[in-house]
């Protein structure tokens, strides 16, 4: 279902609440906001960060999406441009091209392929756009489903661009669910030499290791063997607050609402 029931007039009466933003540290640029009006009884929080890690060519985009309350199913779409390369979740192509639904925008999306996560090992999804490679890593839960679709259904006058979309669906078993994603921009393809360089991401794995009402922690493992921990605070956003939590690899201690540490 669309935010605010798809009613523009209702949505115009509300705006998300900014919890914190930091733009001064070039190694960690971040913004965190909360939305409590889009769905009755549902609290949505989203944090977007650009972080720079040693050994990674360009800054990584880290996306935290956290939902709590009266939850049905959650669809988290990734709209992208370019050529699909591969995904770690096996997809089965659909014989026909039927719309995903009848309302709330689903009627305009063709269903091209579907798949389901068999475990919580996480998703990797790669594509090529403007001669550059992109890989998205996403935390998953067993039973999560995925749909690759394309805009353009029920569009007799061809007003919609036929852009691809990758939809991650989860039906939570509790009143809280968290998605953590990383998008890595890496390498390039030369149309002159027809050669690719750096087509594989230097990230090996992404896992959420702690998710409580107060904190979320994710591990980023690199191909080099290095590990970095990203932590978010959800209750206290003061810049001078000292946070301390126990992790399997040791104690993580930091100041402020978010941290990126090597561990």
Q: Can you say where each PLM-predicted feature lies in the sequence?
A:
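Polysaccharide-binding surfaces and accessory modules of carbohydrate-active proteins
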Residues: 78-142
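Non-catalytic terminal regions with compositionally biased, polar/charged low complexity
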Residues: 167-177, 183-263
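Catalytic and substrate-binding regions of extracellular carbohydrate-active enzymes
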Residues: 1-97, 175, 185-188
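Mature, function-bearing regions of proteins
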Residues: 115-117, 157, 178, 182
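Short, exposed beta-strand/loop patches in secreted or surface proteins that constitute
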Residues: 11-26, 115-117, 201-211, 252
């Amino acid at each position: 279902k669309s935010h605010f029931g798809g009613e523009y007039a209702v949505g115009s009466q509300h705006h998300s609440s900014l919890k914190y933003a930091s733009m001064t540290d070039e190694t960690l640029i971040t913004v965190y906001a909360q939305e409590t009006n889009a769905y009755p009884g549902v609290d949505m929080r989203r944090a977007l960060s650009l972080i720079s890690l040693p050994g990674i060519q360009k800054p990584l985009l880290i996306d935290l999406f956290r939902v709590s309350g009266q939850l049905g199913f959650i669809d988290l779409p990734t709209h992208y441009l370019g050529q699909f390369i591969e995904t770690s979740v096996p997809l089965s192509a659909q014989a026909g091209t039927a719309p995903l639904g009848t309302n709330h925008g689903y009627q305009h999306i063709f269903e091209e392929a579907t798949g389901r996560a068999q475990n919580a090992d996480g998703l990797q999804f790669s594509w090529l756009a403007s001669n550059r490679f992109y890989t998205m890593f996403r935390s998953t839960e067993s039973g999560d489903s995925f749909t690759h679709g394309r805009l353009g259904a029920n569009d007799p006058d061809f007003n919609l661009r036929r852009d691809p979309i990758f939809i991650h669906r989860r039906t939570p078993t509790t009143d809280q669910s968290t998605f953590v994603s990383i998008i890595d921009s890496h390498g390039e393809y030369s149309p002159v030499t027809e050669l690719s360089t750096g087509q594989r991401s230097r990230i090996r794995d992404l896992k959420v290791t702690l998710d409580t009402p107060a904190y979320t922690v994710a591990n980023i493992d690199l191909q080099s063997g290095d590990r970095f921990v990203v932590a978010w605070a959800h209750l206290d956003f003061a810049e001078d607050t000292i946070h301390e939590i126990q992790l399997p690899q040791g104690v993580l201690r930091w100041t402020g609402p978010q941290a990126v540490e090597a561990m």
